Design a protein with these regions (language model features):
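Residues forming the flavin
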Residues: 1, 24, 32-308
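Intrinsic low-complexity, disordered N-terminal segments enriched in polar/charged/small residues
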Residues: 4-9, 28-31
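Polybasic, lysine-rich low-complexity intrinsically disordered segments
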Residues: 5, 11-12, 36-37
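Intrinsic disorder/low-complexity segments enriched in small, polar and charged residues
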Residues: 12-13, 26
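Residues flanking N-terminal targeting/processing segments that define the start of mature chains
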Residues: 16-20, 53
């Protein structure tokens, strides 16, 4: 295993200086890497060049579905009662060898911009504490497997970035970082139409009509359609004509995973602790926080004074 003092992780002055300061002060040189998922391809390539082992990791891509919050409670007993909290749901459907499922369901929420690179569009969802927005939204995504890219992490990263660039180009007519969108029925029929009625888009950079199916590989688009049709049988009104799909969601989790040992330390580079979403060990805020806590405890326990 290589020592971090002999092999800089990246050409980042701040991170390299961090290691050097720890070394000179006599403190252990430990550097957790807790990147948000969807990090730059260049950073991952540089890590591979420095002997950090990176694997292709299963992830998902899809769209955000927006519908009135009242409809989000459809099918629930006493839906709309003031004593009840905002309705939530979690759905999944196997379609052939893939799975379509909902992710990041946000009652009373909105769709937000989450791009981390220029010339790319990424959507995400959130709710404020009161969950008082009139819309409910959730990502509807389809699984992407290692076999889709011959288990090559570089191909997986390139695919993710290609989709984000397509989304940017499709929404560009409405302004920088506007998102492509269409009504859910339009998506099911492959029409690329957007009519704004009772449901208004919440993506604050603006939206424009686009054929979302054309932004995805045909197999993934068809799988999403099959999943949405199945959801209509589980929640009546799920594919209501006024529901809006906003795209794309490409970062439910990282397309790669940095290899680490049972003690959470990087296999090839001493002192490096991959953790969280970007490293491929979480898929959301809570799971990333829990993984970060586990890594922190591992580092602390390694240097904690012996009891007694």
């Amino acid at each position: 295993m290589v020592s971090p003092n002999k092999l800089p992780i990246v050409k980042s002055a701040a991170r390299h200086a961090c290691l050097q300061r720890f070394s000179r002060s006599g403190l252990p040189s430990k550097l957790p890497i807790a990147k948000k998922c969807g990090g730059s391809e260049v950073r991952f390539v540089r890590m591979r060049q420095r002997a950090v082992e990176i694997f292709q990791h299963a992830f998902c891509v899809g769209v955000f579905r927006v519908l009135l919050q009242l409809r989000g409670k459809a099918g629930a007993h006493a839906a709309g009662h003031p004593a009840l909290p905002r309705g939530e749901y979690q759905l999944s459907q196997h379609v052939g060898e893939r799975c379509v499922y909902t992710f990041c369901m946000c009652p009373g929420g909105q769709v937000v911009a989450s791009a981390s690179e220029e010339g790319r569009v990424v959507t995400n969802g959130m709710s404020y504490h009161a969950r008082s927005g009139k819309n409910a939204n959730a990502a509807v995504v389809v699984s992407v497997n290692g076999t889709d890219f011959a288990n090559d992490p570089r191909q997986a990263i390139a695919f993710q970035r290609e989709l984000e660039a397509k989304a940017y180009a499709a929404g560009r007519a409405a302004g920088p970082y506007a998102a492509p969108a269409e009504n859910i029925r339009s998506f099911l029929e492959g029409k690329g139409q957007l009519h704004i009625g009772s449901v208004e888009p919440t993506y604050d950079r603006g939206v424009t009509a686009a054929d979302l199916g054309s932004l995805l590989p045909a197999e993934l688009a068809d799988t999403l359609r099959a999943g949405l049709r199945a959801y209509e049988h589980k929640i009546a009104g799920y594919t209501a004509p006024d529901a809006i799909l906003t795209g794309l969601e490409t970062r439910t989790s990282s397309p790669v995973r940095l290899k680490r040992e049972e003690n959470f330390e990087c296999t090839q580079l001493a002192g490096l602790y991959p953790c969280g979403e970007g490293a491929g060990y979480a898929g959301g805020i809570m799971s990333a926080a829990v993984d970060g806590l586990r890594v922190a405890r591992a580092i602390i326990s390694r240097y904690a004074p012996a009891e007694g």
